[in-house]
């Protein structure tokens, strides 16, 4: 198999798994940085949630990295200048000079079948037959009913909030999570509404016993509590990061293989949530 065509196949491979038509209209997904002179004989693709300077330096120092797939887009709003003064722009300039492409799939991963929200749903609820999207997409496809933002999980066996908190910790690898328990930790949960990242706009108007997401505003948590709805918050990127290692790595490697490309798909060791609980 070839190792020289990774950067040229990057867009096709990512979009074969995460259809860009699923991305939200406000989002900025796709190939965000196309290096003019791609690295030759580079066989690795680096996955990250956030393309920070530390992650960019990690990619640059590893001469086998040809491309970065950054879940969150490093370019979101229009740029009026690209200078070395701005940390993000500095990273882009360095990556371009080093021949490294950058692709961001973001909300296409959120909405896709077997995307980040299905990973959360299977981790918190188990099984697949009791999971559906909160906001289905309008795509004309056989998977349309399963695609979309957020997930509603109807638990086959009602489970205590205490147990679901433990599942959330195990899934995300966190020692601590934030919990709102208006009915107590031993209250039984039958229906979970979840969304990776900042899920308030998705979960808040759903009929559920528990909201499970990365972050909600203070007033959204108060509103949930007033309605007797429990809440588990793990931090924005903590609800996304584990998906890279558990699912995306294998999916991309398999898709590259189908294209006749022997790609080594790796997860950044420098990518981390910016907040730490002490």
UniProtKB/Swiss-Prot annotation:
Pfam families: DUF34_NIF3 (PF01784)
Membrane-spanning residues: none
UniProt superkingdom: Eukaryota
UniProt-listed InterPro entries: DUF34/NIF3, DUF34/NIF3_sf
GO cellular component: cytoplasm; cytosol; mitochondrion; nucleus
Similarity section: Belongs to the GTP cyclohydrolase I type 2/NIF3 family.
Annotated PANTHER family: NGG1 INTERACTING FACTOR 3 (PTHR13799), NIF3-LIKE PROTEIN 1 (PTHR13799:SF13)
Protein known as: Protein NIF3 homolog
């Amino acid at each position: 198999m070839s190792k020289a065509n990774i950067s040229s196949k990057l867009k096709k491979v990512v979009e074969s798994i995460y259809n860009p038509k699923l991305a939200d209209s406000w989002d900025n997904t796709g190939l965000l940085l196309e290096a003019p002179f791609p690295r030759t004989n580079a066989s690795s693709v680096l996955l990250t949630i956030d393309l920070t300077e530390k992650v960019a330096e990690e990619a640059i120092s590893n001469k086998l990295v040809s491309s970065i797939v950054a879940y969150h887009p490093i370019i979101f709003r229009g740029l009026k200048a690209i200078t070395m003064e701005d940390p993000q722009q500095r990273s882009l300039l360095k990556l371009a000079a080093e021949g490294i492409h950058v692709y961001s799939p973001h909300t296409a991963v959120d909405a896709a079948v077997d995307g980040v929200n299905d990973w959360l749903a299977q981790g918190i609820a188990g099984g697949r037959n009791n999971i559906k999207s909160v906001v289905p997409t309008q795509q004309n496809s056989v998977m349309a009913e399963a695609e979309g933002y957020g997930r509603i999980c109807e638990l086959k066996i009602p489970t205590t909030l205490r147990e679901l908190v433990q599942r959330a910790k195990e899934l995300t690898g966190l020692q601590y999570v934030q919990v709102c328990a208006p009915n107590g930790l031993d209250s039984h949960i039958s229906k979970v509404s979840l969304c990776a990242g900042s899920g308030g706009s998705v979960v808040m108007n759903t009929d559920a016993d528990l909201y499970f997401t990365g972050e909600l505003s203070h007033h959204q948590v108060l509103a949930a509590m007033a309605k007797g709805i429990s809440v588990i918050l793990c931090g924005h990127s903590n609800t996304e990061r584990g998906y890279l290692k558990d699912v995306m790595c294998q999916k991309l490697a398999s898709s590259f293989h189908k294209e006749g490309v022997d790609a080594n798909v790796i997860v950044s060791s420098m990518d981390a949530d910016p907040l730490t609980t002490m």
